[in-house]
Regions:
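Short acidic alpha-helical/loop segments enriched in Asp/Glu that coordinate divalent cations
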Residues: 50-56, 74-82
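Residue-level detector of well-ordered alpha-helical segments, enriched
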Residues: 22, 31-38, 69-72, 89-92, ...
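An acidic intrinsically disordered interaction segment
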Residues: 1-16, 68-78, 99
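Short, mixed-charge aromatic SLiMs
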Residues: 57-72, 130-138
Length: 164
């Protein structure tokens, strides 16, 4: 398993229009970090279960990058959507945003898979179905803990499990 495999899997899933639209809706409504959710799902697709400690490390490792780089790029690109004179600039921002997201994937990878706790925080579970592992893993993201947003989490698993 490598960060490149995770990134390629994420891009393939994100290229599906219904999946992308749903993830972007959750990003807007719930402040979901799409790539964090995709990482949780990707681990499940690889029959890996992660513990809350790994999800917490991920959040700490990515927060500054998200706040300082990814979110401002996205917000500016969205704000410029209605101005046709800024179309070329918007396309450039989108390229920068994808590059920033790629770096975010590396931060996620390093926080979880590069940790000395990886052997206890990410466990191989070949006996558990992919959809179940995806559900468990997404449920460990702070946004979805304590039974929050169960229907949204379930729909996300359905969309991504079908594509796996």
């Amino acid at each position: 398993m490598t960060v490149d495999e995770f990134w390629d899997w994420s891009l393939a899933r994100y290229s599906d229009h219904s999946t992308r639209d749903y993830l972007l809706t959750l990003q807007t409504k719930l402040d979901l970090v799409v790539l964090e959710a995709l990482f949780a799902m990707w681990l499940g697709s690889r029959h890996r279960e992660w513990e809350e400690g790994a999800a917490d490390r991920l959040g700490k490792a990515t927060q500054r990058w998200l706040e300082a780089v990814v979110s401002p790029l996205r917000e500016t690109r969205v704000r410029w959507r209605s101005d046709p004179t800024l179309q070329t600039a918007r396309e450039h921002l989108l390229t920068l945003e994808v590059q920033a997201e790629r770096h975010l994937a590396e931060l996620i990878w390093d926080a979880v898979m590069g940790s000395s706790d990886v052997t206890t925080d990410v466990v191989y579970r070949p006996e558990i179905a992919t959809a179940e592992l995806m559900t468990v893993n997404v449920g460990r993201i702070p946004l979805f803990r304590d039974g929050k947003y169960v229907s949204e989490r379930t729909q996300m698993v359905v969309l991504l499990d079908q594509a796996t």
